[in-house]
Amino acid sequence: MSSNLFSLKGKTILISGSAGGIGNATAHLCVNLGARVILTDIRQEALKDTFNSLPDFQEREPLYFAADLTNSDELAALVDFCPQIDGLVCNAGVMKLTLTQFIKEEELIRIQKINLNAPILLTKSLLKKKKINKGGSIVYTASAAGVFRVSIGNGIYASTKCGIDAFMRTIALELGSKGIRCNSVNPGMVETALIGSFTEEEKANEIKNYPLGRFAKPEDIAYGIAYLLSEAAAFVTGTALKIDGGMTLS
């Protein structure tokens, strides 16, 4: 173990949704903290760009594997490709604002598959194949939405993020005896493509809810993820870590 408890030196970490946003920032931070990373995302070219942008440390060469985690065959192929890991970051997610009366079943199913089913099934498959080392750490990107705050039209997204937090707490109980910790980060609004559909007026109105006067940068969330992956969080499990700039205070 490093004398710096926040170091990730010697750890191998699988990061889903790593082609952009929070996943990209997490990949860069983990490498800079000494980890070897395995990147996965459905967007092959963007994933390759992330891979190529990482620092070149030959002794801990990163790996990448493009996969649609809602496809059982591709998920299985990723798990087979993956070496033994010390950390898992489930970060892939999508969002669509829709009033309840206008929800389309196909959209409901699509968002549930990506935000809820995929991280659960990836976790299950890695555990079944005994790919997560004792003393490992699992971190899910959940949300303040639904868990700590609700908003009109956000029922589908919020319900999936509530679901992933409930799953996180359940497996924290299940895996504690194996020394595997399970936590989540719960951001508010983050400056990523996920909020690209918001108008400037909508963003200006929303930012009034943030005491710190801005939305999060992807790096702000990555810092929390890296903490939960590190030995500094060795006694932290079953925790939903709010990183929301004080948004849920109001």
What residue spans do the PLM features occupy?
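Alpha-helical segment proximal to the catalytic Tyr-Lys
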Residues: 128, 173-174, 234
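Short C-terminal tail/terminal secondary-structure segment
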Residues: 2-4, 148, 226, 237-250
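Conserved glycine-rich cofactor-binding loop
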Residues: 19-21
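Active-site loop-to-helix junction immediately N-terminal to the catalytic Tyr of the SDR YXXXK motif
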Residues: 103, 149-158, 170, 198
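Short, small/polar-rich loop/turn modules that mediate ligand/substrate recognition or access, typified
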Residues: 176, 181, 236-238
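Active-site helix of classical SDR
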Residues: 123, 160, 168
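Residue(s) in the substrate-gating loop at a strand-loop-helix junction
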Residues: 143
